[in-house]
């Protein structure tokens, strides 16, 4: 039986700011963009959460909920540096590490000799070492499988840990709300609820063929998770699935012509980012994303095995047709990446200056 630890730093960006600027301690604090520039909250501390402030909320709304909110810009270089320190602690206990972001990771400690092989004691030791090294607290989940370890890390926050032993899995998943399963978002949860499926026990009792028919491959995954099954090994060399760039606009725009003024710069930046992080990867789709003035968003995508500049313009037109008169506050473009490498003879936009004269 495997021993998986999921480490999740507590309100990471905000915690770094409170550490570096002690005057922020005890005050509601958020890291994000300025409200007068239509910024969005990246992370907030627990004091801010008491007022209803949440990640991905507009800074304007956050300040409405909490007028005394201290809003600071992010310092990504600092967050990356501290993240490297945190990962150095992980490496003392295992070399099987799957980073998920700057502030969370899976660790497989099945064969680790530390703490007499106890995953619970290792999680505690890791959290203590992180605090000694960085002054930041972390929470941990311990379980035999990945998705339960991730769920468990959220059950005793902040600065705590939670263990799900193998024999507890059937009882634990029985009443587990489906929305708690990684990969089940609000839209999927609503579709499941429409079928009368609210928790894992509901899925266990639902006809498998109907679930697979309704959700395809994800239906198979959902059935596994509902039965406490997750055979996935840790992915130590996680390949990016996509590369994208987006911009939040200072003022809402409404016309296709206005969008066309912004799109070339986004495409150029997309090419630059791909050159840095996905130079040898083959693309398999192009995507345009719009977020409207009511904060609802839409995405349009199309299969493509090489970058087609004109396709972004076509997708933008299709997306804008869904605006129903609403203003556009955010515009983004991205490409989906396959696991395959680019053929050396295939046309590529990576690293090149794009000719955007259409």
Swiss-Prot record:
GO terms, molecular function: damaged DNA binding; DNA-directed DNA polymerase activity; magnesium ion binding
PROSITE patterns: UMUC (PS50173)
Organism per entry: Shewanella denitrificans (strain OS217 / ATCC BAA-1090 / DSM 15013)
Record localization: Cytoplasm
Keyword entries, A-Z: Cytoplasm, DNA damage, DNA repair, DNA replication, DNA-binding, DNA-directed DNA polymerase, Magnesium, Metal-binding, Mutator protein, Nucleotidyltransferase, Transferase
Entry annotation: catalytic residues: 104
Function: Poorly processive, error-prone DNA polymerase involved in untargeted mutagenesis. Copies undamaged DNA at stalled replication forks, which arise in vivo from mismatched or misaligned primer ends. These misaligned primers can be extended by PolIV. Exhibits no 3'-5' exonuclease (proofreading) activity. May be involved in translesional synthesis, in conjunction with the beta clamp from PolIII.
Binding of Mg(2+), residues: 8, 103
EC top class named in words: transferase
This protein's GO CC annotations: cytosol
Record protein name field: DNA polymerase IV
Gene this chain is encoded by: dinB
